[in-house]
Amino acid sequence: VSGLSANAVLDSLEAAAGRFVALDLRFVVVALAFQLANLALRSFALRNVIQAAYPERRISPVTVAGAYAAGVALNAFAPARGGEALKIALLRLRIPGSSVPTLLSAGVVLTLLDALIGSSLIATAWGLGALPVLPSPPVPSLGLLAEHLLVVGGIVVALVALTATVARPLARRARGIWARVEQGGAILRTPTRYLRSVVTLQLAGWTCRIGVAFSLLAAFGLPATVPIAVLVVVAGGLSTLVPTPGGAGTQQVLLVYALQQTATTAAALSFSVGMQVGITAVNTLIGITAMMLMFRTLRPVAAVRAARAARP
């Protein structure tokens, strides 16, 4: 049995290697163009949100694009989307008078539409059976539930008492922080401007993400249709929910399952690995280049060190 298993593994590896060799570079170039466009569109949408928060000063699209690209690059290697901290730190450093709560709130504005689109696509994919269904958790007994309710109730009472004790001294500071948070979402007060300068760019960015998946499916010789490309994007988005660098491992499992009706396991695995490695390489190259420009150095290592020093 072990001999057969070893042969099966070798056959799968050979099949995967063969797909890499047979890549259609024309579609790879198209995928690269879509990826660059996606990064540019999303960074410009973020710039417009920040510009609305700070109308008295001009926010450079290049500054925001550099910080955004650096954050995306780090997300591929840091767990739990650690690149977001770098993005905020670089924006705080390059935008005089800006504050962390305002910049964080500006980033949240972008997640509103992303969450709506992403959750809709995920729900549709699960409803069609394209994604695995998680098992239902066991129902606790009434006695155990009552014990937990008592514990939770005690904790809530303690928290309320503690909050009442420290709330007054912290109230003034909390109001100041909340004012800065509201400042970050200032563009939402002008729905027309929000739709024109943010939503349209985000929708175009989502189209580019689907274009990346579609082009890479074609490059690997797999069935390339819009529904399958959307499924690939959904699997990639779900993989980021697991706190591993770039969703590594999780993305491969989800894509192998999602593509089981249209591709062999070896083909789906080689496609998933190739797509993740390729996108990570592109994002990393762009991110390092952006940091070199922001810190005005020709040495990539020096740029990375400067970016690390800028992180909170």
Kindly label every feature range from the protein language model.
Residues 53-54, 93-95, 220-221, 259-263:
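Short helix-loop-helix connector
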